[in-house]
Curated annotation (Swiss-Prot):
UniProt similarity note: Belongs to the ABC transporter superfamily.
Principal place of residence: membrane
Transmembrane intervals: none
Protein name listed in UniProt: Putative ABC transporter ATP-binding protein TTE0246
Short name of one Pfam family: ABC_tran
Amino acid sequence: MDKVFELKNVSYFYTPKVPALIDISFDVKLKEKLFILGANGSGKSTLLKLMDGLIYPHEGQIRFFGKVIGDKRTFDEYEFRRRVGFVFQDSDVQLFNTTVFDEIAFAPLQMGVKKEEVEKLVNEILISFGIEKLKDRPPHRLSGGEKKKVALASIIVINPDVLLLDEPTNGLDPRSKKWLLSKLEELNQKGATLVIATHDLEMAKKFSDRIIILNEEHKIETIGSPEEILNDEKLLLKANLI
């Protein structure tokens, strides 16, 4: 099956009269780099949380490789958590262990990987991400770019098939941003499917395969190629992206 996610008529409400998302339908294809663009408050973060099963839609359904997320009869929560990683916009939300090493080791230990194997995996990730010198540091004392690296490393260590990333370049300096894009490209080349919510048009232009625009009415405005969407000034103005 080449559809990783299938969303059909998904709606979510903060309160009965305050919608976050209305009638959202789209598919995510295997190994693609799908960008979700929208102004602040359009529902991008909520959409990623729905796709990660952190919250559930009030209307419609979301399927992951054909199985409805949250369906107690057919949905395997453990398998889903192994295959899908979520990188939050605010790295501090994600980082809660006392050292960088423990942070990266947390997920594989929770998955039941043997301690010796976990140590090997973590050391490999530390080297791959160029953060081996940080392994004994408390995550909350790191710079923004370092925190983002640790947050991503703590997800990559379990080798997920899918990465959901919420504003991954937010607050990063140019060097850290360049590193992040290079690492995401490397992961995609190895087969990872990427779903990225952002209002970073430059990143979308360089990196996306397909783009979804969320409007300020919390609906999908359009879906198309980077060329179609990013060259349409009227569309970008309407969506409050420029």
